[in-house]
Structure formats: C-alpha cells, structure tokens
Amino acid sequence: MAVVAEPQQPDLREPAGWRRSSNRIATWLMVLAFVLVIIPLGFVLFTVISKGASIISWQFLTGSPIPPNVLPAGIGGMWPAILGTIEITALATVMAVPLGVLGAIYLNEYGGKNWLAALIGFMSDVMTGVPSIVMGLFIFSIWVLHFGFSGLAGAFALGCLMLPVVIRSSDEMLKLVPDSLREGSYALGATKARVTATVVLPAAIGGIVSGALLAVARAAGETAPLLFTILTVTTANPNVFSGANTAIPSQIFANATSRILRPPV
C-alpha cells in the first residue's frame, strides 16, 4: 500500500518579523524604482516650464515665426506650426485609424491563419520597426519628387507610421473580448458582420481608442518624416493638400538649427 505524504504546512508559530521586513524591503525597492523613472520626466517638465512659461503669450500662439537667419525684432510666434500640426495629424489620423481598425478586425475575426492575414501581420510588424526618417525618405521618393512638398505628403508619412500601431493595439483589444459574447450572438442567429459591429467592437472600443490616441501622440511628435515632406515654411497654409507647410516639430528643428540662434564659437 503506497504511503501518500501529506503536504507540509508553514509553521505559523515562527516569528513573522522576517516576512514583514522582506515585504518592507520589496515595497521600498518598488518605490525607489518608480522615483528613478519619474525623476527624468520631472526634470524635463521643470526645465521646459521654467524656461518657456515666460514666453507663452497670445502673440506667441497667434503670430508667425521669424524666418531663419534673420535678426529678430521679437520672439515670433508658432501659429503656422500649430495649424500645420493640427491639419497634418488630423489627415494622417483619418487615413490610418479606420484602415488600422479594419485590418485588426480582419486579423481577429475573419482572416484566421490564411495567407492574407499572415501577410498583414508580417507587414505590420515590419513597419513597426521602420525608422521614421526612412519612412520620410520613402514618401519623398515616391510622392514629393513628383508632386512637390505638401501637408498631404507629411500626412502620408505619419499615417504609415501610425498604421502598424493601430493594427496591433486594436488586434490585442479584440482578442480580449470573451468568445462567450460572440457565441451567444451566434446562438441568436446573428451574422458574423453583425456580431462584429454590435458586440465585438463596442466591447473593445475603449482599448481601440486608447491605441489610436497613442498612435496620434507618436505621429504628432515626429520630426524626421516632416523634414522630407512639408519643407517647413514660416507662413500658415490652410490648404493641407497643396503647397509647402509647417508643423511644430519641424519648426522647432528649424529654430534650433538657425544660425541666429547658435551661440558664438
């Protein structure tokens, strides 16, 4: 007859001092790690606010920037860059977000393991790792050389950078929707398209929106693609589809590399 060993129970009579001490040590280590992560961000925010708060004014927000290499009579403004950023980012969002969500729906609900789903997944992974400057050069070679600089070219570049982020984040959110919701809808006779539109998407909409906002935030801060696509001018261009344009990241780069702003050697 085999003897089954009983599982050993912890001796609760032993002093709990070591357990409490180890818990405190772990807690303080996590707090320290959190502080070490926050310190650089706090330093950046403090520097930006302390050095830039005195410059922010209505004139700065509504005025035009001073052309590079021109002796300034004032600090200039950022209105053309603000308008350009809104236009280009909005157009890139309109291009990338619907296409990315539709791609994620196909991957998760329709594609399964067929060749098209595998191709979409592979290309989204590859595009995620493409440097932004390479994407800018790509749009420059296939669009700008033929049609000229424009906000539309910048939107194409930013949209290509946003697309894989939207696809992957939306795909992960759709995977989190319980299969029981789908099965219950199918049991009621709903079609796959109706289940996707009325059950799956509403259940995952919060995560999809969060992923889209992350993609928008990334696109709005990109500089390299815009240097090759919009030209960066000092006047506002409300027509995002034609003519050179500007944006906040590219305008900051132009200001930083302007000779008039360089310290004497």
Describe every region a protein language model picked out:
Residues I39, T85, T89, T93-I105, ...:
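Hydrophobic positions within alpha-helical transmembrane segments of bacterial inner-membrane proteins
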Residues T93, S169-S170, K192-I230:
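Transmembrane alpha-helices
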Residues A26-T27, L99-I139, I167-E172:
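Cytoplasmic-entry segments and transmembrane alpha-helices of multi-pass inner-membrane transporters
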Residues D125-M162:
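Generic hydrophobic transmembrane alpha-helix motif, especially the helices
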Residues P68-P72, L226-V265:
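Interhelical loop and adjacent transmembrane-helix boundary motif
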Residues Q9-L32, T47-A92, K113, A254-P264:
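Periplasmic/extracellular loop-to-transmembrane helix junction in inner-membrane transport proteins
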Residues S21, I25, M78, I82, ...:
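Hydrophobic alpha-helical elements at and bordering transmembrane segments
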Residues L99, G112-A117, G121, R182-S210:
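Amphipathic cytosolic juxtamembrane alpha-helices at the membrane-cytosol interface
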